Amino acid sequence: MSTNLIDSFGRKHTYLRLSITDSCNFRCLYCMPDEPFSSSSSSKLMSSDEIFGISKIFTEQFGISKIRITGGEPLVRHDFAEIIEKLATLQVSLGVTTNGVLLDKYFSLLQQNQIQLLNISIDSLDSERFKQITKRDLLPQVWDNIMQSISLGFKVKLNAVIMKGVNDDELLSLAMLSHNYPIEMRFIEFMPFYGNSWEKGKVMPINEMLQVIEREYSCIKLHDDKHDTSRKYKLSEDSKGCFGFITTMSNAFCGGCNRIRLTSDGKMKNCLFGAEEFDLLSLYRAGEDIGNLIKEGVWRKHKEKGGQFTEMNTVDNSKIINRSMIKIGG
Protein backbone atom coordinates (compact mmCIF):
# COMPACT_ATOMS: atom_id res chain seq x y z
CA MET A 1 0.00 0.00 0.00
CA SER A 2 1.34 3.45 -0.92
CA THR A 3 1.76 6.38 1.46
CA ASN A 4 0.19 9.70 0.51
CA LEU A 5 2.55 12.62 0.10
CA ILE A 6 0.98 15.33 2.25
CA ASP A 7 2.51 18.71 3.05
CA SER A 8 2.01 20.70 6.26
CA PHE A 9 -0.99 22.49 4.70
CA GLY A 10 -2.81 19.25 3.93
CA ARG A 11 -2.17 19.23 0.18
CA LYS A 12 -1.92 15.75 -1.33
CA HIS A 13 0.66 15.33 -4.09
CA THR A 14 -0.07 12.96 -6.98
CA TYR A 15 1.70 14.60 -9.93
CA LEU A 16 5.43 14.46 -10.76
CA ARG A 17 7.02 16.84 -13.26
CA LEU A 18 10.04 14.86 -14.40
CA SER A 19 12.88 16.65 -16.22
CA ILE A 20 15.18 14.30 -18.11
CA THR A 21 17.59 16.88 -19.58
CA ASP A 22 18.56 20.53 -19.36
CA SER A 23 19.62 20.55 -23.02
CA CYS A 24 17.41 22.19 -25.63
CA ASN A 25 17.44 22.94 -29.33
CA PHE A 26 15.67 26.27 -28.68
CA ARG A 27 16.88 29.33 -26.76
CA CYS A 28 13.59 30.84 -25.60
CA LEU A 29 14.08 34.21 -23.93
CA TYR A 30 11.72 33.45 -21.00
CA CYS A 31 13.44 30.13 -20.24
CA MET A 32 17.15 30.50 -20.95
CA PRO A 33 19.45 32.77 -18.93
CA ASP A 34 20.91 35.77 -20.75
CA GLU A 35 24.44 34.65 -20.00
CA PRO A 36 26.30 31.84 -21.83
CA PHE A 37 24.71 28.51 -20.91
CA SER A 38 26.18 25.03 -20.70
CA SER A 39 24.12 21.88 -20.29
CA SER A 40 24.97 19.43 -17.53
CA SER A 41 27.42 16.63 -18.27
CA SER A 42 25.90 13.17 -18.67
CA SER A 43 27.48 12.00 -15.40
CA LYS A 44 25.44 14.58 -13.49
CA LEU A 45 22.17 13.62 -15.15
CA MET A 46 19.97 10.75 -14.08
CA SER A 47 20.51 7.71 -16.29
CA SER A 48 17.52 5.97 -17.84
CA ASP A 49 17.69 3.31 -15.11
CA GLU A 50 17.85 5.97 -12.39
CA ILE A 51 14.92 7.85 -13.91
CA PHE A 52 12.89 4.65 -13.90
CA GLY A 53 13.99 3.56 -10.43
CA ILE A 54 13.23 6.88 -8.76
CA SER A 55 9.95 7.25 -10.66
CA LYS A 56 8.95 3.76 -9.55
CA ILE A 57 9.45 4.77 -5.91
CA PHE A 58 7.22 7.81 -6.43
CA THR A 59 4.48 5.75 -8.06
CA GLU A 60 4.56 2.55 -6.01
CA GLN A 61 5.47 3.92 -2.56
CA PHE A 62 3.82 7.34 -2.69
CA GLY A 63 0.86 7.04 -5.04
CA ILE A 64 2.02 9.37 -7.80
CA SER A 65 -0.54 8.80 -10.56
CA LYS A 66 0.63 11.23 -13.23
CA ILE A 67 4.09 11.92 -14.65
CA ARG A 68 4.82 14.69 -17.13
CA ILE A 69 8.18 14.27 -18.91
CA THR A 70 9.90 17.60 -19.49
CA GLY A 71 13.30 19.15 -20.25
CA GLY A 72 14.99 21.21 -21.44
CA GLU A 73 13.67 19.56 -24.54
CA PRO A 74 13.15 15.90 -23.61
CA LEU A 75 13.21 14.68 -27.21
CA VAL A 76 16.86 15.72 -27.70
CA ARG A 77 17.99 13.12 -25.17
CA HIS A 78 19.65 10.23 -27.05
CA ASP A 79 17.93 7.56 -24.94
CA PHE A 80 14.48 9.18 -24.94
CA ALA A 81 12.92 6.04 -26.44
CA GLU A 82 14.44 3.84 -23.74
CA ILE A 83 13.16 6.17 -21.01
CA ILE A 84 9.65 6.16 -22.47
CA GLU A 85 9.55 2.38 -22.77
CA LYS A 86 10.62 1.96 -19.14
CA LEU A 87 8.24 4.55 -17.69
CA ALA A 88 5.36 3.10 -19.71
CA THR A 89 5.55 -0.05 -17.56
CA LEU A 90 4.49 1.95 -14.49
CA GLN A 91 0.83 2.22 -13.51
CA VAL A 92 0.70 5.94 -14.19
CA SER A 93 -0.64 8.50 -16.67
CA LEU A 94 2.26 9.70 -18.84
CA GLY A 95 2.57 12.89 -20.86
CA VAL A 96 5.32 14.82 -22.61
CA THR A 97 6.05 18.56 -22.76
CA THR A 98 7.98 19.53 -25.88
CA ASN A 99 8.74 22.34 -28.31
CA GLY A 100 7.47 20.01 -31.03
CA VAL A 101 10.34 20.17 -33.50
CA LEU A 102 11.31 16.50 -33.23
CA LEU A 103 7.86 15.03 -32.57
CA ASP A 104 7.49 13.46 -36.01
CA LYS A 105 10.39 11.12 -35.16
CA TYR A 106 8.59 9.80 -32.08
CA PHE A 107 4.87 9.58 -32.87
CA SER A 108 5.05 5.80 -33.32
CA LEU A 109 7.00 5.34 -30.09
CA LEU A 110 4.48 7.41 -28.13
CA GLN A 111 1.52 5.57 -29.61
CA GLN A 112 3.06 2.15 -29.01
CA ASN A 113 3.48 3.06 -25.34
CA GLN A 114 -0.04 4.48 -24.96
CA ILE A 115 1.15 8.06 -24.37
CA GLN A 116 -1.58 10.42 -25.57
CA LEU A 117 -0.91 13.63 -23.64
CA LEU A 118 1.23 16.24 -25.41
CA ASN A 119 1.99 19.80 -24.30
CA ILE A 120 3.56 21.75 -27.16
CA SER A 121 4.99 25.27 -26.92
CA ILE A 122 4.03 27.81 -29.58
CA ASP A 123 4.57 31.43 -28.54
CA SER A 124 3.89 33.00 -31.93
CA LEU A 125 2.27 32.21 -35.27
CA ASP A 126 4.52 34.70 -37.05
CA SER A 127 7.77 33.24 -38.37
CA GLU A 128 9.94 36.26 -37.62
CA ARG A 129 8.57 36.70 -34.12
CA PHE A 130 8.84 32.98 -33.45
CA LYS A 131 12.50 33.26 -34.40
CA GLN A 132 12.91 36.30 -32.13
CA ILE A 133 11.50 34.43 -29.12
CA THR A 134 13.11 31.01 -29.67
CA LYS A 135 16.26 32.06 -31.58
CA ARG A 136 15.35 29.36 -34.09
CA ASP A 137 13.66 29.60 -37.51
CA LEU A 138 11.59 26.45 -37.03
CA LEU A 139 7.93 27.50 -36.93
CA PRO A 140 6.93 25.45 -40.02
CA GLN A 141 8.27 22.24 -38.46
CA VAL A 142 6.53 22.94 -35.15
CA TRP A 143 3.24 23.76 -36.86
CA ASP A 144 3.34 20.66 -39.06
CA ASN A 145 3.94 18.47 -36.02
CA ILE A 146 1.10 20.12 -34.11
CA MET A 147 -1.25 19.38 -37.00
CA GLN A 148 0.01 15.81 -37.22
CA SER A 149 -0.43 15.36 -33.45
CA ILE A 150 -4.06 16.40 -33.75
CA SER A 151 -4.72 14.20 -36.78
CA LEU A 152 -3.20 11.19 -34.98
CA GLY A 153 -5.58 11.66 -32.06
CA PHE A 154 -3.20 12.89 -29.38
CA LYS A 155 -4.68 15.05 -26.61
CA VAL A 156 -2.90 18.32 -27.37
CA LYS A 157 -2.36 21.35 -25.16
CA LEU A 158 -0.57 24.33 -26.70
CA ASN A 159 1.39 26.68 -24.43
CA ALA A 160 2.20 30.33 -25.11
CA VAL A 161 4.04 32.58 -22.66
CA ILE A 162 2.51 36.01 -23.24
CA MET A 163 4.82 39.00 -22.79
CA LYS A 164 3.79 42.61 -23.22
CA GLY A 165 5.50 44.22 -26.16
CA VAL A 166 6.60 40.85 -27.52
CA ASN A 167 3.61 38.70 -28.50
CA ASP A 168 0.57 40.10 -26.68
CA ASP A 169 -0.88 41.28 -30.00
CA GLU A 170 -1.30 37.62 -31.02
CA LEU A 171 -3.75 36.71 -28.26
CA LEU A 172 -6.74 36.60 -30.59
CA SER A 173 -5.05 34.60 -33.34
CA LEU A 174 -3.71 32.10 -30.80
CA ALA A 175 -7.11 31.87 -29.07
CA MET A 176 -8.72 31.14 -32.44
CA LEU A 177 -6.71 27.92 -32.61
CA SER A 178 -8.98 26.62 -29.85
CA HIS A 179 -12.01 27.39 -31.98
CA ASN A 180 -10.69 25.71 -35.11
CA TYR A 181 -8.96 22.68 -33.58
CA PRO A 182 -9.72 20.21 -30.73
CA ILE A 183 -6.95 21.52 -28.50
CA GLU A 184 -6.53 23.50 -25.28
CA MET A 185 -4.68 26.77 -25.93
CA ARG A 186 -3.04 27.91 -22.69
CA PHE A 187 -1.78 31.44 -22.10
CA ILE A 188 0.94 31.57 -19.45
CA GLU A 189 1.85 34.68 -17.49
CA PHE A 190 5.55 35.58 -17.74
CA MET A 191 7.29 34.28 -14.59
CA PRO A 192 10.58 35.30 -12.92
CA PHE A 193 13.50 32.86 -13.08
CA TYR A 194 17.24 33.22 -12.90
CA GLY A 195 18.62 35.16 -15.84
CA ASN A 196 15.40 35.65 -17.86
CA SER A 197 15.19 39.47 -17.52
CA TRP A 198 11.76 39.33 -15.91
CA GLU A 199 10.02 42.65 -15.34
CA LYS A 200 6.59 43.32 -13.90
CA GLY A 201 5.80 45.52 -16.89
CA LYS A 202 6.19 42.56 -19.24
CA VAL A 203 3.55 40.50 -17.42
CA MET A 204 0.07 40.49 -18.96
CA PRO A 205 -2.29 39.30 -16.21
CA ILE A 206 -5.40 37.25 -16.87
CA ASN A 207 -7.84 40.16 -16.59
CA GLU A 208 -6.02 42.05 -19.36
CA MET A 209 -5.70 39.00 -21.61
CA LEU A 210 -9.35 38.07 -21.15
CA GLN A 211 -10.42 41.66 -21.80
CA VAL A 212 -8.66 41.61 -25.18
CA ILE A 213 -10.36 38.36 -26.21
CA GLU A 214 -13.80 39.39 -24.91
CA ARG A 215 -13.77 42.50 -27.08
CA GLU A 216 -14.31 40.14 -30.00
CA TYR A 217 -15.99 37.11 -28.44
CA SER A 218 -18.60 36.37 -25.77
CA CYS A 219 -16.47 33.79 -24.01
CA ILE A 220 -18.01 30.88 -22.12
CA LYS A 221 -16.46 29.99 -18.75
CA LEU A 222 -15.84 26.27 -18.27
CA HIS A 223 -15.59 24.27 -15.05
CA ASP A 224 -12.14 24.10 -13.43
CA ASP A 225 -11.17 21.12 -11.30
CA LYS A 226 -9.44 21.59 -7.94
CA HIS A 227 -5.96 20.78 -9.25
CA ASP A 228 -6.23 22.56 -12.60
CA THR A 229 -3.52 25.11 -13.30
CA SER A 230 -5.48 26.57 -16.21
CA ARG A 231 -8.67 28.63 -15.91
CA LYS A 232 -10.60 27.49 -18.97
CA TYR A 233 -12.99 29.14 -21.46
CA LYS A 234 -14.49 28.56 -24.90
CA LEU A 235 -14.80 31.23 -27.57
CA SER A 236 -18.26 29.96 -28.51
CA GLU A 237 -20.55 26.95 -28.22
CA ASP A 238 -19.32 25.56 -31.54
CA SER A 239 -15.61 25.82 -30.69
CA LYS A 240 -13.78 22.53 -31.20
CA GLY A 241 -11.50 23.15 -28.22
CA CYS A 242 -10.97 25.54 -25.35
CA PHE A 243 -8.45 28.08 -24.08
CA GLY A 244 -7.20 28.89 -20.63
CA PHE A 245 -4.90 31.01 -18.52
CA ILE A 246 -2.09 29.88 -16.23
CA THR A 247 -2.18 32.73 -13.74
CA THR A 248 0.86 32.07 -11.58
CA MET A 249 1.64 35.76 -11.11
CA SER A 250 -1.75 37.45 -10.82
CA ASN A 251 -3.94 34.74 -9.28
CA ALA A 252 -1.89 31.80 -8.02
CA PHE A 253 -3.34 28.29 -7.72
CA CYS A 254 -1.07 27.22 -4.83
CA GLY A 255 -3.97 26.18 -2.61
CA GLY A 256 -4.77 23.22 -4.86
CA CYS A 257 -1.22 22.36 -5.87
CA ASN A 258 -0.54 18.63 -6.17
CA ARG A 259 2.81 18.85 -8.00
CA ILE A 260 6.38 17.84 -7.24
CA ARG A 261 9.33 18.45 -9.56
CA LEU A 262 12.39 16.33 -10.17
CA THR A 263 15.24 18.05 -12.00
CA SER A 264 17.36 16.26 -14.58
CA ASP A 265 20.21 16.04 -12.06
CA GLY A 266 17.99 14.30 -9.52
CA LYS A 267 17.02 17.13 -7.17
CA MET A 268 13.45 17.22 -5.92
CA LYS A 269 11.79 20.64 -5.79
CA ASN A 270 8.52 20.89 -3.91
CA CYS A 271 7.64 24.11 -5.75
CA LEU A 272 8.52 25.71 -9.06
CA PHE A 273 9.70 28.80 -7.18
CA GLY A 274 11.20 27.02 -4.20
CA ALA A 275 14.83 27.66 -3.28
CA GLU A 276 15.11 24.36 -1.40
CA GLU A 277 16.24 21.26 -3.28
CA PHE A 278 16.39 17.69 -2.00
CA ASP A 279 19.15 15.56 -3.51
CA LEU A 280 17.49 12.23 -4.26
CA LEU A 281 20.01 11.10 -6.85
CA SER A 282 23.06 11.10 -4.57
CA LEU A 283 21.21 9.00 -2.00
CA TYR A 284 19.86 6.68 -4.69
CA ARG A 285 23.32 6.15 -6.18
CA ALA A 286 24.65 5.34 -2.72
CA GLY A 287 22.02 2.64 -2.34
CA GLU A 288 20.25 4.56 0.42
CA ASP A 289 16.51 4.82 0.96
CA ILE A 290 15.13 8.05 -0.54
CA GLY A 291 11.61 7.69 0.85
CA ASN A 292 12.17 9.70 4.03
CA LEU A 293 13.78 12.56 2.10
CA ILE A 294 10.85 12.63 -0.33
CA LYS A 295 8.37 12.83 2.55
CA GLU A 296 10.42 15.49 4.34
CA GLY A 297 10.77 17.56 1.17
CA VAL A 298 7.05 17.55 0.48
CA TRP A 299 6.19 18.29 4.12
CA ARG A 300 8.41 21.38 4.04
CA LYS A 301 6.62 22.90 1.06
CA HIS A 302 5.70 26.55 1.57
CA LYS A 303 2.12 27.76 1.43
CA GLU A 304 2.68 29.86 -1.67
CA LYS A 305 5.30 30.36 -4.39
CA GLY A 306 8.15 28.71 -2.55
CA GLY A 307 7.96 31.30 0.23
CA GLN A 308 9.84 33.76 -1.98
CA PHE A 309 7.02 36.18 -2.83
CA THR A 310 3.26 36.49 -2.68
CA GLU A 311 2.14 39.44 -4.79
CA MET A 312 3.50 40.28 -8.22
CA ASN A 313 4.06 43.87 -7.08
CA THR A 314 6.60 42.73 -4.48
CA VAL A 315 8.77 40.61 -6.80
CA ASP A 316 12.45 41.52 -7.00
CA ASN A 317 13.90 39.03 -9.46
CA SER A 318 17.45 39.83 -8.39
CA LYS A 319 16.67 38.50 -4.90
CA ILE A 320 14.86 35.30 -5.87
CA ILE A 321 16.98 32.21 -5.20
CA ASN A 322 16.26 29.70 -7.92
CA ARG A 323 17.53 28.03 -11.07
CA SER A 324 16.84 29.19 -14.60
CA MET A 325 13.67 27.69 -16.02
CA ILE A 326 15.59 25.33 -18.29
CA LYS A 327 17.48 23.94 -15.27
CA ILE A 328 14.24 23.32 -13.36
CA GLY A 329 12.19 21.74 -16.11
CA GLY A 330 9.15 23.13 -17.88
Model features per residue range: what roles?
Residues P36-S41, D126-I133, F193-E199, D279-L280:
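A short acidic, helix-capping loop that chelates divalent metal ions and anchors anionic groups
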Residues L45, I51-I69, E73-I188:
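Radical SAM/AdoMet-radical enzyme domain recognition
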